Amino acid sequence: MIRQRTLKNTIRATGVGLHTGEKVYVMLRPAPVDTGVVFRRMDLEPPVEIKASPDNVGDTRLSTTLVNGEVRVSTVEHLLSAIAGLGIDNLYVEVSAAEVPIMDGSAGPFVFLIQSAGIVEQEAPKKFIRIKRAVEVREDDKWARFEPFDGFKVGFSIDFQHPIFSNGVQTAELDFSTTSFVKEVSRARTFGFMRDIEMLRERQLALGGSLDNAIVLDDFRILNEDGLRYEDEFVKHKILDAIGDLYLLGHSLVGAFTGFKSGHALNNRLIRTLIAQEDAWECITFEDENESAPISYAQPVTAF
């Protein structure tokens, strides 16, 4: 049987909020079976809980933001990507502000935190969402699609007219039965253009953004002295984002996702469209010892 997973211990970290530029504390706590991923705003009295789910997604302009009434937690996608990549089902995420700290702009620090806390299996079968037929959403020339696949596969294409992209388009496809999320995806950082960052700062946004937590480009080159962590780091970060956005479904996917110039808004529209079409998916478990589960989920990933 493939079992649900949570953390072995509670662990805490400190970082900077991408948009406020202020110090943010985050604490990851184990949670009981069937809890899912629940964010808690501990700076409020009483603390307010927001479950990671498609219906609780509010603003998707610059990051994925979860809302409960007037209360919000933004920039959740990198942490959710790490949680998904390590197969964690149940977790409390306590934060001291309205955003998750940006850390180094990737999911790597969150992977390290989760692995440091330890991962334990729980006495309940892990639930999966299996894609039964293709579902697609489009907006202008952008699109995102789910298709049936025996495992978990993510493909993505980005298109930027910039000198560092030889033909504008960068594409990657990763089958997680043969690819390690931790090694190949988790360290890919968010990226932005200097001109956009300056415009955001005028609107009191991206105040915590720096070369320490993003790849920054001017009109000609990458400004980070250390260069890239992966040759295709830009598109791999979009895959990282997508994995986090898709985990708002609440369960790991058995299926394939493909995105072309998709972002948080379109990713969220796709998962809402999927949920609404009940013949397009099913919730499954792998409880029979003789049943062959998709190889991507056979063992927890516990090391870099």
Curated annotation (Swiss-Prot):
Residues of the active site are H264 (proton donor)
| UniProt keyword list | Hydrolase, Lipid A biosynthesis, Lipid biosynthesis, Lipid metabolism, Metal-binding, Zinc
Where Zn(2+) binds, per the record, is at H78, H237, D241
Pathway(s) annotated for this protein in UniProt: Glycolipid biosynthesis; lipid IV(A) biosynthesis; lipid IV(A) from (3R)-3-hydroxytetradecanoyl-[acyl-carrier-protein] and UDP-N-acetyl-alpha-D-glucosamine: step 2/6
Top EC group: hydrolase
Question: GO molecular-function annotation terms?
Answer: metal ion binding; UDP-3-O-acyl-N-acetylglucosamine deacetylase activity
CC annotations in GO: membrane
The protein's Enzyme Commission number: 3.5.1.108
Q: Which HAMAP family match?
A: LpxC
* Record family assignment: Belongs to the LpxC family.
**Protein name listed in UniProt:** UDP-3-O-acyl-N-acetylglucosamine deacetylase
> Lineage of the source organism?
Bacteria, Pseudomonadati, Pseudomonadota, Gammaproteobacteria, Chromatiales
